[in-house]
Structure formats: structure tokens, C-alpha cells
Amino acid sequence: LTLTNFGNQDKVTVLSKIITTITVAIALTLFSASCNTIILTLQPFEPIYGIPIQVFALPMILGYLGIITAEVKKENIIPLLAGLIIGLFLSLPAFNELAIFRFNSDIPVLMKAANFVHAAMDFLRIFLILGLIGMALLGLPLFMTIAGIALVLYVGGGQTPTFITYTGYNLLRDSSLPAIPLFTVAGFILSKSGATKRLVKLFREAFGWFPGGEAFAAVLVCVFFTTFTGANGVTILAMGSLLAGILLDTGAYQEKTVHGLLTASSSIGLLFPPSIAVIVYFIAGTFIYQNNPDFVGSESFTVTNIFLGTIVPGIIFSLAMGGSAVWISIKNKAPRHQFNIKEAGSALLNTLPELLIPLIIVLFTFTGLASLTETASLLILYLLIVEGLFTYKDKKQEQISNAIGDDFKFMVSTVSDAVSIAGGTLIIIAMARALSNYLIDFGLAEYFVTWTQNIVHSKVLFLLLLNILLLITGCLMDIFSATLVIVPLIIPLGNYFGIHPVHLAAIFITNLTIGFLTPPIGMNLFLASYAFNKPVLTIYKSVVPFFLLQLVVLVLVTWIPALSLVFVR
């Protein structure tokens, strides 16, 4: 990549071809392993509603096959072939496993080849892992990086790649996991409907009359939409320009202040139910607490309690961001939006269906009337009815033809966008769980815990180091993979230092929420740069004051457990 006769375009081309080769190699290996998972581990005599269980696992195979076929392009022939060859080489242990356990056949040549792959991966383990991490920084998709590291560790440790795909399949059978794509679909229905404009109008009418009210309203809108889409990036990209335009039109704020406020507010919604981050944390921690019932407060480790534990920190974050806007507005002597009770009442009436959403979630989830997955399903049904009626009403008022085909296209587009986000999240979760299981099964997690206990003897020092580690982790990794990899390591340490499970969860999720803003590579910084069409360094500078304010809130959440435990049952 550094040859002097290469221009910048050539460097990008070579890099993309290397990424293609790695992607195809890993995807083909996981495709082979997925076939083994279906053939060797799933019993055909366990049908679901009369349908063979293997049918439900087919998307796993088709997904990896789709990744490979997506790279089939004329300009990719050489890297594609290279990836296929490497993938076949890495699949040899899986082929050998299939021959032995399915066909009861020991093929000496295949067995020797599989053993050679194990030995080669073991010898090159460190170099391959460092190489994958380096390629991740240069553009290799995160789930491929995690899958590649898991592949190197498992195969280098004498196991077959089937362990990875089987772990992912087992995780996807978790009863809480379907809530993730369902809430994502619900969030996208909400964000793509007219609810956005109605909520913005409501919050402006309700809060715009006091100093900084419109900025405070913008914070609430960001929080609301991040909560229900489950992806803070969607909030920035879909609503950043709209909200920035509204605030800049007031003349009360500098452009950098507006961009910093909206960027900093875009991830706060991850602290409110039905936060997908909380669901993933619960999934990651359940295995640990089930196997260690003697851990401090293990009986309190429920998804409902974690939801309750992050509500107060979320409120404090929202007040901190909104309060800073109020202070800036007072300082600049900004004009206020005149309160009109008629307009406010009309806006309230129009947004009543959306305002009932939190109540629906609380009513069904926290009272036990429905499981999290059932609540998500009911929410989708509710939104389809409500937003469908409002869409029809809006079109009628604007005298727009309400063709059935247009509504169908809207639904297909919404579900397609939601599925791409949810699918990406689920595959990251599956690969991260496989890596996490390796750390546990091979004793690396236990070694890390013991090593930490030997050098950290103070709860104060542990919490300080934990916050630093999690801020860095949140900067480098997405919240889902970070949760599944890191949580099994910190829960035993939290128990050792006497930290309540719900308090630990609140600290963890709060840190990773702030991690999205942490320079130099916090994800939201780059998304904001794109959304606001500003250099990323400009976004850095605009975010710093709000980032520091959020660190103050983090200190409160860390050192005042009551903030997280006040509602815990």
C-alpha cells in the first residue's frame, strides 16, 4: 500500500481487494461450518409446528452465501478466487468433522490436512489476530473482524469452525432476542411516518416558551427516537439536519453549539426502555448469573430491573444536555417562542398516540402482562394502525392520492431498512457471543479476573479503571459486540468488589453511550460529520463541552448507586 508508484486511488483499490479476500474467506468458512451445524447438531425429529428445525436454520447458511455472492464482480475475480481458496483451506477441519460424524469415515489425507490447518492457525495466531484488528481500522466490517478472530482462536485451539456457528445459532434461540429486530422495526415505522414532525411541533410548543426551550425540545426528540429505533446513528442521519435547521433559525445558538448538542444527545435514548442495549446486556449477563447464583444480587438481575436501573441516569443525561442549552440561551439573551395554549393543545392531541408508546411498554413489560418480545409485537401492530391512520389523514389534508401501492412501497422500504439494521446487529451479536464463549471456555476470562484481582485491591480504583476501559471500548467497538465480549469479564469482578448487578449494568451502558462521542474515533462523531456536512475535527471541537458534561454525569452514576437502584425490585 505504500509503494511510491501507487496513487491514492490505487491504494484504496488494493485495500478493497484485500478486504474482499478476507471477507470471502471468512464467509466461506462460516458457510461450511453452518452446513455442519445443520447436518450434525440439529435433530430432524424435533420439528416445530410440523416443520423440520433445519428449515429455521437455513437463513444462517443463506446469509453467509449472500455475503460471498455480493463480492462477485468483474473487478473482484482475483481477490474472490483468493478468498475462496483460503476459505476452502480453513474449512478443512469442518470437512473432516463431517466425514467422521456424518459418514463414519476416517479419511487419512483429509485428517492430516485438517491437522495441518490447526497447526498453522496456532502458529500464526498472534499475527493473524493483529492483522484482523489492523484491517478493521482500515475498513474490514466489524462482524467479519470478530468472526475472524473467533475463527483463528477456535481453529488454532484445535476446534472446528462449527463451534462458532453453533454458538451463534443457540444464541439466536434466546427468548429475549426476537425483541431486538421487532423493536427496530417499530422504531423505523415511527421515524419514517409523520410522527417526526408531530413530535417536533409538540416539544416546540410545550417547551419553546422558556429560555432554551426549543433546544431542550430537540434533546427530547433525539432521546425519543434513539430509544425506539435502537440505533443512535439513525437519529443523527434522519433528524440531525431538521433539528439543526430549527435551532439555527432561532438565532440563539452558534452552529457549533447546535451540532455539538445534537450529536451528544443522539445516544442518550439507549438508557431508556425498550433499549436494545439493555436487552443485549441482559442476554450477555444471564449465562454468568445462572452459573453463579451466589453472586451479589443475582436474583435482581432481570431485564425489567436493568430497564428501571438506567431510567434515572437517562433522565439526568437529558436534563444535563437540555440544561446546558437553557444556560446558553439565557447567556445569549435569545428570543423566546410565544406560548399558545391552542397550538399546544392541538399538538398534544395529534401526538397522543406516540406519547402513549412508553405507557404501553411500561404497562405490558413491567407488570408482567407480556414478555418483551410480545410487547414489541404488540407495539408494531399498534404503530401500523395508528401511523397508518395518521398517514391517510395527512395525505387527505394535502390532497395526495392514497394509492395502495404507495403504502405498500412505504412498508417494504421501512421493513427493509429495519431488517438491514437488525440483521447487522444480530450477526454481530452472534459472532461476539462465539468469541465470548471462547474466552470463558478456555479459561481466559477466569485468568483475566484473577489477574485483575491480584493487582487491583480497591473498589475505588476498580471503578476508575472500569470507566476508562469502557470509554475506550465504546469508542472502538459498537455497543453490542462490546457488551457480549466485555460483560463476561466484568461481572465476576463486579461481584468481587461488591457492586450490585443493576448498578454495574447502568455504569456499563452509560459508559458505552458516552463512548460514541469519545475522540478520536467515536462513531457518532463521524456520523455527525456526514449529517451536518462538516469536517470531523470541527465536530470534535463542538462536542467537547457536552462530552465533558456527560463525564460529570458518569461520575454521579458511578459513585451514587442509589441513582440506579431506586426503582429496582
Region annotations inferred by a language model:
Residues 36-40, 44, 77-569:
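Alpha-helical transmembrane segments of multi-pass membrane transport proteins
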Residues 1-101:
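Alpha-helical transmembrane segments and membrane-interface helix-loop junctions
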